[in-house]
Amino acid sequence: MIEVALGAGLGASVRYLITQVLKSKTRVFPWATFIINITGALLLGFLHSKITSSHILLLLGTGFLGGYTTFSTFQVELVTLVNNRKQKMMIIYLLLTVICGILAAYCGSWLGKL
C-alpha cells in the first residue's frame, strides 16, 4: 500500500509540473492532458510487459502512473469544449486521445518485450 501512495504523490506532482509548463503555451487544444495521458499509456504498456515484481508494478504502475494520468481532467476538458461551442475540437480531442492512447499502450507493450 505504501508503494501506491508514494508513487501516486510523485506522479501527481510530475503531472502538475508538466501542466504548468504547457498551460501557457496552449490555447484551445488541451495539450498537457493529452501528452500526459498518452505518455502514461505508453509507460504502463511497457511496465506490464517488462516488470514482473508486484511491488514495482504497484509503485510505478498503480501509484506513479495512476497519479500521473488523469481521466477526470480529460472528461472535464471535453465538457468545457462543448460548453464553449467547440464541438469539432471536442470530437478531435476525444478521438485522438482514445486512438493514440491505445496505440501508445500497444507500442509500450511491444517495447517492453524487446
Curated annotation (Swiss-Prot):
Q: Which UniProt keywords apply?
A: Cell membrane, Ion channel, Ion transport, Membrane, Metal-binding, Sodium, Transmembrane, Transmembrane helix, Transport
Question: Which top-level group of life is the source organism from?
Answer: Bacteria
Q: What coarse category fits the chief subcellular location reported for this protein?
A: membrane
Cellular component (GO) terms are: plasma membrane
Q: Pfam families recorded for this chain?
A: CRCB
Q: In this entry, which stretches build a coiled coil?
A: none
List membrane-spanning regions: 28-48, 56-76, 91-111
Q: Name one GO biological process term.
A: cellular detoxification of fluoride
What's known about how it's activated or inhibited?
Na(+) is not transported, but it plays an essential structural role and its presence is essential for fluoride channel function.
Q: Where in the cell is it found?
A: Cell membrane
Molecular function terms in GO for this entry?
Answer: fluoride channel activity; metal ion binding
Q: Which reaction does it catalyse?
A: fluoride(in) = fluoride(out)
Where do the annotations place Na(+) binding? 66, 69
| PANTHER family from the UniProt entry | FLUORIDE EXPORT PROTEIN 1-RELATED, FLUORIDE-SPECIFIC ION CHANNEL FLUC 2
What this protein is reported to do is described as:
Fluoride-specific ion channel. Important for reducing fluoride concentration in the cell, thus reducing its toxicity.
Q: What is the name of this protein?
A: Fluoride-specific ion channel FluC 1
What organism, scientifically named, is this protein from?
Ligilactobacillus salivarius (strain UCC118)
